[in-house]
Amino acid sequence: MGENKSGKVPHQRIVANGIEFDSKAEHDRYLELLVMERAGVIKNLECHPRWEIIPAQKIPGHRGFQAAHYTADFRYFRDGVEHVEDVKSSYTREAQDYVLRRKLMYLVHGIYVEEVVR
């Protein structure tokens, strides 16, 4: 796969079991988690769970702002503890919007997003 105009190698979206994954790495992690769920190691695997991290804002005399959300790659429970994961490359884990949203997840919901770097 060649580079695009920005010099980055584009990721390849994959659809499996009716679920769209942003990359092969995310799909591969899903397959790993499915095996773990079937083996009883984890429970309640969920793809692309979403949380509101900033509520919509109404500003008198203006349009206001829509709510901001964080969508993780996976959520599951292991030994009764909730785990939220995001699959990232070493490049995408540095994106400013991702870093901010990840921090807001912890601030607003008390949820630490675990990074799976591939």
Where do the PLM segments sit?
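Electrostatic, structured charged patches in enzyme active sites and in nucleic-acid/phosphate-binding
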Residues: 1-118
